[in-house]
């Protein structure tokens, strides 16, 4: 069983184009499920008015105690778990994927369970992969889009967490602010899965690791070179490198490096080789995987023209893949802007594994959901 560590991220501004995130230790786990069985007492206790403001801290602490006591977990950061647990989840993903691919539909561990999926940021892959996977394993998923729920605006996140916990067995959220996912996990009495924040994208990296195991035979000890913006995908690769040993290189323009504290955390773990490079051709030499993502993420589209200029020379094209060598695979978390960060030729090449990678979102997430629910 993995060791679970909680984190808090404080946001301050560094430069003009991205937040600087400082991780600090913070214990935030959760509260007991409420029994619906009738009380043995002959008369009900008198009702009292409870102040949400006054009770927020004790409630969060009791949520932590109960969630841990019930064997439930959150999936917020890759490095909340140890290497043994990460590999165990990936093994389970392969096992359940094989079962589903065989056409067997008798494995239904989520029968009678519901999941709320909060989407502050829309996503085809995240919605369909979670909803389909949960359904195939017997559960029912509920989509909550920006018009259904506005955490921190129409309703406080701590209230959303408590309400949804009383309706559901699990909550998945894809949000902008990393603090939103931390608050959901803090106040929810059911497991919370991070479907993406501006800081990290742990479910994607689990799918990536699964894809590498299938195509390379392993991901431990490989060389992964990410070419592009030092964004949430990079942060998740760095957090994985703090748990599992491999060689990770982020090749990005100056001024677009990943969060310095996260880089330092990965280096301090002392198990992986971590490099930040500004020379993509040199960086990709000997790579097992060349990885790319959009240059302007959701919420940065007004910077698209500026970023295209800044990222000249960082497009993944055939010349760059040739520099990587014949064993290199190409990966992309999608959606891709073909002709911008990657050429159409590379996406469609035999060494491109972007579509198996996309499929593995569902299989990796199925295993994550099984793990957090103690199945």
Curated annotation (Swiss-Prot):
Carbamoyl phosphate binds at residues 123-126, 174, 201, 204, 333-334, 361. Keywords: Amino-acid biosynthesis, Arginine biosynthesis, Chloroplast, Plastid, Transferase, Transit peptide. Its EC number is 2.1.3.3. Pfam families: OTCace (PF00185), OTCace_N (PF02729). GO terms for biological process: arginine biosynthetic process via ornithine; citrulline biosynthetic process; L-arginine biosynthetic process. GO terms for cellular component: chloroplast. L-ornithine binds at residues 232, 293, 297-298. It catalyses: carbamoyl phosphate + L-ornithine = L-citrulline + phosphate + H(+). Gene3D superfamilies: Aspartate/ornithine carbamoyltransferase. It is found in: Plastid, Chloroplast. GO terms for molecular function: amino acid binding; ornithine carbamoyltransferase activity. SUPFAM superfamilies: Aspartate/ornithine carbamoyltransferase (SSF53671). The active site is at 333 (proton acceptor). HAMAP family: OTCase (MF_01109). Homotrimer. Belongs to the aspartate/ornithine carbamoyltransferase superfamily. OTCase family. This is Ornithine carbamoyltransferase, chloroplastic. The lineage of its organism: Eukaryota, Viridiplantae, Streptophyta, Embryophyta, Tracheophyta. The gene is ARGF.
